[in-house]
Amino acid sequence: MRLSPVFVALLSGLLAADLGLARSVAPRVADSPAAVTGTRKTSLLKNVAGLPPVPSAAQVAATSLNTDDIQGDILVGMHKQKQLFYFFAINDPATFKTHLASDIAPVVASVTQLSNVATQPLVALNIAFSNTGLLALGVTDNLGDSLFANGQAKDATSFKESTSSWVPQFAGTGIHGVIILASDTTDLIDQQVASIESTFGSSISKLYSLSASIRPGNEAGHEMFGFLDGIAQPAINGFNTPLPGQNIVDAGVIITGATNDPITRPSWAVGGSFLAFRQLEQLVPEFNKYLLDNAPAGSGSLQARADLLGARMVGRWKSGAPIDLTPTADDPALGADAQRNNNFTYSHAGFDLGSDQSHCPFSAHIRKTRPRADLGGSLTPPNLSAGANSIMRSGIPYGPEVTSAESASNTTTQERGLAFVAYQAQLSQGFHFLQQTWADNANFPPGKTPATVGLDPIIGQNNGQPRVVNGLLPSNSSASLSIPQFVVSHGGEYFFSPPISAIGGRLSA
């Protein structure tokens, strides 16, 4: 006998309640006209060797977090295969609220649903709102985040960034929200978009959209420059099973109103997270040419020496192997091993942490954005320093692979890059802090010799001017390089990803 999905969902809810596992939000079934319905046989998420795995159903069952009420993208991380970011404006708040409550809230994918293939939808739908979007809905509550309230365009100067290169729709506060769709095929996402647009009708207008996809074949999990991305995700205390060297943070660092969130939130906003979205173009052919032109002297082929320079700029080889553990040559087996590839602190016996750059430059991207022992934390993993400045990354590459013509001319002709997504409970301690206080700060990490470290060679910004970076050449750590901007921001927005109960509750009232 074949049981219907509705019966299975109801039976699961009854069993969970009987076992004491029920959360505050009742099981939901995808009977909304806004949903693309069907039975999923394979996961819409992809585990990649070397990255922290997708949260399991067992972890979800054991946690005290209300994972039925937390939108799935917040804690799933960088595991989506296909994704669409649909940015919209609200034209008719009353009609929008009606459909938000009746058609969208019932099908928003939770962490619980995404942890098990049996409960995953064909298309995972999440939704988040800008401050102007909340105001359009009549929600004036103070969420306790001034950066969110002001919007990302007003924050651009903090990052030494001009909005002249931004997508026009981001250069203001006109975007009210973003619907995030994830699946394993573009066709399913297209069907979901058609359903959403039919449901909302003229109550919303699409302002902009960005399609994104995991890279093909062996490049799955790698960003457009070719480096395995997302290894250093934090582990949430009481939810994730920490990997060796993984930063362990309280849930309140990522989830509003959770353990050790220092800000008092409106009751309806407990269980949400602030979403920083950035469209970051990557000039891959130009980046590769720069590495060849500036490859350090030494033995080995020109390409091998160029790869070494790239690894020292990032802090990892393309495989994900950290140069702090393998400073002169890639070790793909290490890169693919999540039990080893994050288990380091930058401290080495017999080497001075304040002056040694033979293992890893002070300016390397991953050292700038997670300094480990540089901030005086434990010299033994896991290093808990800077836990309050952790973010949960959930981005994905966008755009086509580099063409042979682009490689031959060393010139980008088709846009590609990273749809950067970061979740945190405080933007001022998360994304904003990492970019402004660490990546864009030439004197960070502190207490080093020489004191001027230089900007983050990957994401550091200098108002469009060349960035001076020190310590990248292994034979001369005092030498500096002037590095063009190979990651170009096309802007973004700050959103609040509310708890699911608020989507059909406070935001629809």
From Swiss-Prot:
GO terms for molecular function: heme binding; lactoperoxidase activity; metal ion binding; peroxidase activity. It is found in: Secreted. The keyword 4Fe-4S does not apply. It comes from Auricularia auricula-judae (Judas ear fungus). Its cofactor is heme b. Changing residue 420 to W: Does not acquire new sulfoxidase activity. Changing residue 208 to S: No significant effect on enzyme kinetics. The active site is at 229 (proton acceptor). Manganese-independent peroxidase that is able to convert a large number of compounds, but its physiological substrate is not known. In addition to classic peroxidase substrates (e.g. 2,6-dimethoxyphenol), oxidizes dyes such as Reactive Blue 5 and Reactive Black 5. NCBIfam families: Dyp_perox_fam. Glycans are attached at residues 343, 383, 410, 476. Residues 23-61 form a propeptide. Heme binds at residue 365. The gene is dyp1. Retains >80% activity after incubation at temperatures up to 60 degrees Celsius for 10 minutes. Retains 50% activity after incubation at 65.5 degrees Celsius for 10 minutes. Activity is lost after incubation at 70 degrees Celsius for 10 minutes. Residues 1-22 form the signal peptide. It holds the Pfam family DyP_N. This is Dye-decolorizing peroxidase AauDyP1. Its EC number is 1.11.1.19, 1.11.1.7. Belongs to the DyP-type peroxidase family. It catalyses: Reactive Blue 5 + 2 H2O2 = 2,2'-disulfonyl azobenzene + 3-[(4-amino-6-chloro-1,3,5-triazin-2-yl)amino]benzenesulfonate + phthalate + 2 H2O + 2 H(+); 2 a phenolic donor + H2O2 = 2 a phenolic radical donor + 2 H2O. Inhibited by imidazole. GO terms for cellular component: cytosol; extracellular region. Changing residue 420 to G: Acquires new strong stereoselective sulfoxidase activity favoring the S enantiomer (KM=0.37 mM for methyl-phenyl sulfide(MPS), KM=0.13 mM for methyl-p-tolyl sulfide (MTS)). Optimum pH is 4.5 for oxidation of 2,6-dimethoxyphenol. Retains 100% activity after incubation at pH 2.5 for 4 hours. Retains >60% activity after incubation at pH 2-11 at 4 degrees Celsius. Retains >60% activity after incubation at pH 3-9 at room temperature. PROSITE patterns: DYP_PEROXIDASE (PS51404).
